[in-house]
Amino acid sequence: NPEGGTKNYVFSTHDTHSELCNAIRVVKGYRKEKWGYFLRAESFYNVATKEEEYGGIDSARYHERSHGEGFLALAQNNLQPNGLYLFDEPEAALSPQRQLTLLMEIYKCARKGAQFFIVTHSPILLGIPGADIYCFDDGKIHLCEYEETESYQITEMFINNREVLLDRLLKE
């Protein structure tokens, strides 16, 4: 489902299929995931509604929480060892503090055998220990170090040179 959820979620509130789905090929190997979840910050509301409907998870009450707290709870409730997880810009829903919480949850789950594919611009989530980071530069995909990512470099530049940077950016 392009909006998110498990492989069993079949719903669509808006046709958002990407051409990327035509370029992906699933290859079965020795390891089979026992659980999987696709989570996007932008379609959280729809997935949370279906999660409550499909799973009958009344106790989660995702819609009674703030966007970030509900998103984090949905992620936490669906992380399991030996799972396969696709997260699309999860930082869009989370404060820096909650990004650290998600980082801890991902790290703990990965140590128990889960695999994660995370598309992110967050220097916090890029910092997950042991993560392989792939950068997309000039139409090429390559492994890169944490400190080589644009997200890290821009954040570092802002923190270390905020006044100079803002002066240059906002100068009329």
Label the model's feature ranges.
Residues 1-53:
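ABC ATPase nucleotide-binding domain signature region
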Residues 20, 24-26, 61, 73, ...:
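Conserved phosphate-binding elements of NTP-dependent enzyme cores
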Residues 36, 84-86, 115:
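Residue-level preference for the first positions of well-ordered beta-strands
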Residues 42, 120-122:
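A short beta-strand-to-loop transition that corresponds to the Sensor-1 phosphate-sensing loop
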Residues 65-87, 97-109:
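GG-anchored amphipathic helix commonly corresponding to the ABC/SMC/Rad50 NBD signature/C-loop
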Residues 88, 118-119:
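Conserved D-loop beta-strand region of ABC ATPase nucleotide-binding domains
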Residues 91-92:
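Short loop immediately C-terminal to the Walker-B catalytic DE motif
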Residues 97-115, 122-172:
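C-terminal lobe/lid and adjacent interdomain/linker elements of RecA-like ASCE P-loop ATPase modules
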